């Protein structure tokens, strides 16, 4: 068995194991290349310190910091708590960053759902929350539960554009599958493409923040209320044939290199998606190893093109089923690959998941023509997130 090293855009990736992807009917079986030097968690993982406080527009922070930095962060936290205490939970938000060109905001993220709040009639209050990926645009509006339909949503979305002086977006992402009909119809009336996707990272984290700062302080707040429209987590299905690669590997990339990949994504890759690491508060040490999955394919460009339309949001090593699970859209889960369940493969999968947790859920997917090649055809930065509390 040979030793392989996967490379992403000139950065050496610590390859744990190269495994064949399952083959569709009639396709030849590919070879298996196992690393002769499996990486153990103790040698390879750098665990970040406790999360530091959020800045006013930052949803959360994952960092490694000194005691001096921690002290300064604590002072900032005190100031932010004081500011949060002044928030009126019944006020609505209508904000556009004055330093941002309104024409540059071409994609929105939205949620339209009930909140754990009762109005004067004793009925649940609904809320529209709209933002962009950088939180340069922020808009909220409350609605009574008897006014929930596509016309209400259409008019509210149009009012976002009018109130903030921004054009209607090209695309709107949303993460609740139960609202797909209403959202798609409302967006369609406005000539906007509605995209079901859990890549609404800024929105999801903003909702978590609003639960703590706004909803829980509202006079009508109902503690312990379960979300009316919970997120789906369906059983994974068979991977479509056009998404098959040849083999894959658990890999790791230093955080400094991940930043470089994200910063150069538009310049170097036709396919892929990044995340705003600064906004999300990822301030890990440059040497912190971020886990990922590298996929080799002899038809890497077509594969990356197909993957690019999936709204990929996460990958998971399911050690119980000895499978690699790909999550996409809002409620789509595929068995991307199975692998032989052994003590060694289970340990590698567990170490990979532990590395994700240590990095605050950050991980990536890279598609290459060859695991030994210098460069990627596609690169997606992914993030594990818990479901929002509302």
From Swiss-Prot:
Annotated compartments: Plastid, Chloroplast
GO biological process, alphabetically ordered: chloroplast organization; intracellular signal transduction; lipid metabolic process; photosystem I assembly
Coarse class of the protein's main subcellular location: plastid
Keyword Chloroplast attributed: yes
One GO CC term on file: chloroplast
Covalent S-S links between cysteines: none
Record's keyword annotation contains Transit peptide: yes
Disruption of the gene: reported phenotype: Pale green leaf phenotype.
Transit peptide, start-end: 1-69
A GO molecular-function descriptor: phosphatidylinositol-4,5-bisphosphate phospholipase C activity
Low complexity compositional bias, start-end: 61-75
Keywords, sorted A to Z: Chloroplast, Plastid, Transit peptide
Region span, Disordered: 16-85
Function of the molecule: Nuclear genome-encoded factor involved in the biogenesis of photosystem I (PSI). Required for the accumulation of PSI during plant development. Does not seem to be required for the translation of mRNAs of the PSI subunits.
PANTHER family per the UniProt record, alphabetical: PROTEIN TAB2 HOMOLOG, CHLOROPLASTIC, PTHR34556
Name of the protein described by the UniProt record: Protein TAB2 homolog, chloroplastic
Gene (name only): TAB2
